[in-house]
């Protein structure tokens, strides 16, 4: 400690911590190969991960107000727990954001010596035939959907035209109206007041 109550930095202490390794390496040393494989499969299958996290969704537990102030806590507590990073999140949005975050991916790569995202390929490496096939299928699906939509619109328009024609045909025609009243659009020149 310095004279002003501040902590002084000991470079040797932090160098020793850096040489000893990170938390993920100690996690790797404490787990058996079976547990390590289970942990790996847990974080590579997102559907299974979310289903497991949501199993306690409707359970209610009381928490202190001090716990709900921050978005995550170190260690396993009530909420959504990340085994790799040893963090607990209060809601799914923060949890999923953490799973997609670079820090989580780096810890996963350090622990398992392989990338978290397995399906990575450069779009320049896609064969021309595969690209053309996907493109033609996409265009074909689009045309089919649009043709169905236009057919349904035409059918609706024809139905409304038929209904209008029926209404016009069922309207009684008044032969006794004068040409002037027909032209003006009313039946007679009488007043509506009584």
UniProtKB/Swiss-Prot annotation:
Any one cellular-component term (Gene Ontology): U4/U6 x U5 tri-snRNP complex
SUPFAM superfamilies named in the record: beta-beta-alpha zinc fingers
Record's keyword annotation contains Glycoprotein: no
Single Gene Ontology MF annotation: zinc ion binding
InterPro entries (alphabetical): Snu23 (IPR040107), Znf_C2H2_sf (IPR036236), Znf_C2H2_type (IPR013087)
Function: Participates in pre-mRNA splicing. Part of the U4/U5/U6 tri-snRNP complex, one of the building blocks of the spliceosome.
Protein name from the UniProt record: 23 kDa U4/U6.U5 small nuclear ribonucleoprotein component
